[in-house]
């Protein structure tokens, strides 16, 4: 919510979201909404089924695969004459059901040169994941067979998910920008024992490699505890990797 400028948070002035705002201005803006499960896969399963996680059976990302035999929103719409599609992140450890067309990222998906799974194969696609998902979504919309049929499209972007790797054209976009801190950045935990007991270790839970883009060397023992370089540097072409490291080297 803080990241969408339509809600008026100060971050929205630094990084506005005009296209999302337009959807709100022309449609509806939810003021009292909540997320029943903030983890990516379970949240997606809840949206698909309209059920809480303990009811739809997908409670964590590394659980058994989502049960695609149960009733879902796309199945209902498909049965009522809608053309259905899902493009982008899926991460439900099972193939999509209820969709006439699907093209999903492999597992969590990669930011650079990601692998896409379709009904027939898994293929590596050169490019930045946000650009590719947008491109394939537009191609599906333009190439729909039933132009007069209603459609239901789920476009799931990877880029809201850590490790927040920008497109190369954005490496220096906010280099000299100071972002306002959220109100609870320096929260007070006195008298809140349960909150104190939650994992608060910055290195373990924040992943400095993910969030600060600090790479100490691909052969460093510290990489055993830092999943960030292995998460996407390996999918970059050698020249892409060099440009990325050069962009952050001086800042680190």
Q: Across the structure, where does each feature detected by a protein language model lie?
A:
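Formylglycine-dependent sulfatase
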Residues: 1-252
């Amino acid at each position: 919510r803080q990241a969408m400028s339509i809600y008026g948070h100060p971050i929205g002035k630094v990084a506005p979201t005009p296209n999302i705002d337009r959807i709100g201005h022309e449609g509806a803006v939810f003021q009292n909404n909540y997320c029943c499960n903030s983890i990516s896969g379970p949240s997606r399963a809840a949206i698909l089924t309209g059920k809480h996680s303990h009811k739809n059976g997908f409670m964590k990302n590394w659980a058994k695969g989502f049960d695609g035999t149960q009733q879902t929103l796309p199945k209902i719409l498909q049965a009522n004459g809608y053309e259905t599609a899902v493009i982008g992140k899926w991460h439900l450890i099972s193939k999509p059901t209820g969709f006439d067309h699907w093209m999903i990222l492999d597992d969590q998906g990669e930011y650079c040169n990601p692998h896409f799974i379709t009904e027939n194969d898994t293929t590596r696609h050169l490019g930045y994941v946000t650009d590719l998902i947008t491109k394939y979504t537009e191609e599906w919309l333009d190439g729909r067979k039933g132009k007069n049929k209603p459609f239901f499209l789920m476009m799931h972007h990877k880029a809201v998910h850590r490790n927040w790797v920008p497109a190369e054209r954005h490496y220096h976009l906010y280099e000299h920008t100071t972002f306002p801190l959220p109100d609870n950045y320096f929260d007070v935990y006195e008298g809140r024992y349960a909150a104190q007991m939650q994992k608060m270790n910055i290195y373990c839970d924040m992943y400095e490699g993910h969030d600060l883009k600090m790479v100490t060397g691909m052969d460093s023992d510290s990489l055993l505890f830092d999943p960030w370089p292995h998460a996407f540097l390996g999918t970059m072409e050698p020249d892409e990797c060099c440009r990325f490291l050069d962009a952050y080297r001086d800042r680190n």
